[in-house]
């Protein structure tokens, strides 16, 4: 009887601490998109709609995710020149006010 009471006490303690851990900001189910491989071919700038940088410590590599006009997302290496040129192109394109 003492063993089951001690086991129940231990189980309740673990359950109480696990809810506190889950309530922490890092434990929130946030979607972090990670890139494990990079697109090997250069993407035409005219096909690109926007981009976002992946710098999360939860991801193995820093990356840039481009979104195409067809809605596809492609991972690219931010160190490659064509990726940097595409980022500059999209920054200028999105800054230009439309009439």
From Swiss-Prot:
Which cysteine pairs are covalently linked by disulfides here?
A: 34-59, 35-75
PROSITE patterns per UniProt: SMALL_CYTOKINES_CC
- Give the main localization category: secreted
* Compartmental location: Secreted
Gene Ontology, cellular component aspect:
extracellular space
Name the keywords, alphabetized. Chemotaxis, Cytokine, Disulfide bond, Inflammatory response, Pyrrolidone carboxylic acid, Secreted, Signal
What Gene3D superfamilies does the entry give? Answer: 2.40.50.40
Membership in a protein family: Belongs to the intercrine beta (chemokine CC) family.
Record protein name field: C-C motif chemokine 2
- The gene name reads CCL2
């Amino acid at each position: 009887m003492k063993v089951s009471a001690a086991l129940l006490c231990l189980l309740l303690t673990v359950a109480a601490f696990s809810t506190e851990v889950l309530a922490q900001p890092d434990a929130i189910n946030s979607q972090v998109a990670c890139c494990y491989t990079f697109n090997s071919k250069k993407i035409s700038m005219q096909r690109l709609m926007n981009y976002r940088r992946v710098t999360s410590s939860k991801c193995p590599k820093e990356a840039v995710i481009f979104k195409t006009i067809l809605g596809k997302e492609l991972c690219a290496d931010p160190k490659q020149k064509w990726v940097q040129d595409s980022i500059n192109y999209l920054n200028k394109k999105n800054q230009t006010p439309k009439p």
